[in-house]
From Swiss-Prot:
Record function comment: Component of the spanin complex that disrupts the host outer membrane and participates in cell lysis during virus exit. The spanin complex conducts the final step in host lysis by disrupting the outer membrane after holin and endolysin action have permeabilized the inner membrane and degraded the host peptidoglycans. Host outer membrane disruption is due to local fusion between the inner and outer membrane performed by the spanin complex.
Keyword Disulfide bond on entry: yes
Membrane topology designation: Lipid-anchor
GO cellular component term, pick one: host cell plasma membrane
Chain residue ranges for the region called Proline-rich: 32-44
Species of origin: Enterobacteria phage P21
Lipidation (S-diacylglycerol cysteine): C20
Record's protein name: Spanin, outer lipoprotein subunit
Residues anchoring lipid (N-palmitoyl cysteine): C20
Periplasmic topological intervals: 20-62
Length: 62
């Protein structure tokens, strides 16, 4: 049993050493795309249209 543990330790040691000394690959930071132009425009002004309270009214209770 002791021989098996020693053999595992000897086999794992190079993997540990290589893993600790190798450089980690880091992906480049991707810049986000610009938003579409219609998002950047101010919202339209709908105050000139008929207000909804003139079109929709609560029904009478009866």
């Amino acid at each position: 049993m002791r021989k098996l543990k020693m053999m595992l330790c000897v086999m794992m040691l190079p993997l540990v050493v290589v893993g600790c000394t190798s450089k980690q690959s880091v992906s480049q930071c991707v810049k986000p795309r610009l938003p579409p132009a219609w998002i950047m425009q101010p919202p339209p002004d709908f105050t000139w249209q008929t207000p909804l309270n003139g079109i929709i009214s609560p029904s009478e209770r009866g």
